[in-house]
Amino acid sequence: MKRRQRLTARSRLRAGIRCHNRFYNAMVQDLASAKRNGVYGERLAPLFSELVPAETLKTALGVSLAFEVNLGQRRPDCVCTVQFGKGSDAKGVCILIELKTCRFSKNMNTASKNLQRKGGMRQLHDSCRLLARTLPPGSGEIVLAPVLVFVAQRGMRVLRVTRLSPQVVYSNAAVLSCTISRLAEYAPPVSAKSTRRRCVAKGTKAKAFSTKAAAEPVPSITPAQPSAAAAVVSLFPAAVPANTTNAAAVHQPVAVSHVNPLAWVASLFSPK
């Protein structure tokens, strides 16, 4: 009986890990599509649309995704950084995502899901606190937005999105993105199919076109550290100062503001 319970627990753990990995890969593709087309898909809309409108994402200077970010005591599943300008005073948004997977989605108020919710909110609170302590110096206003997401293991449908109160911190958005990238410990694999485009013209043999693929590049996987497996998916890299490494290594006290940060985000996209 105990052995069967152990096997069941292991199989559930493996299923959860597989779902996490599939969702990571889907996020990479969905965010690349949203950046290119200015429209969020069904998965990303409940996660991003309230903070960063899709049309604004399309014109953002830099957008990056990092997975399994090692902050020491906590490891948020995904961190997305969006940069809206150049320089140390550029504004940005940093979305911390904690992912919880569900085998059954009909009832979202079961005891196990309530435990998952409480644990996820605690993890997000700790992740924000740890990230705020290690921000690189800078004067740009950056919104830290923690989000808890429940996902169905079958179909990877987003079942529920819960948000913690966002915070406004002051840092360098470009250096922050690089800092988070170096802490990433997982990168979704690149599919061989995604590197090809088939010719569909009538009477022409289907084949891969490397020139056309270069015009619409597939998001590349850049190792975060050459000597380790840690990597980050940088979809649309922003220009980073040459002294990024040195600047990121210096940590200064961070001023945090809780005064209506969502209103500030909305003001970024209001007509001038």
UniProtKB/Swiss-Prot annotation:
The keyword Cytoplasm does not apply. Induction: Expressed late in the infection cycle. One of its GO terms (cellular component) is host cell nucleolus. Its main location: virion. InterPro entries: Herpes_UL24 (IPR002580). It is found in: Virion; Host cytoplasm; Host nucleus, Host nucleolus; Host Golgi apparatus. The keyword Phosphoprotein does not apply. Keywords: Host cytoplasm, Host Golgi apparatus, Host nucleus, Late protein, Virion. It comes from the Viruses. Belongs to the herpesviridae UL24 family. May participate in nuclear egress of viral particles. Plays a role in the dispersal of several host nucleolar proteins including NCL/nucleolin and NPM1. Since deletion of host NCL/nucleolin negatively impact on nuclear egress, UL24 supposedly acts on this process through its effect on host nucleoli. This is Protein UL24 homolog. It comes from Equine herpesvirus 1 (strain V592). The lineage of its organism: Viruses, Duplodnaviria, Heunggongvirae, Peploviricota, Herviviricetes.
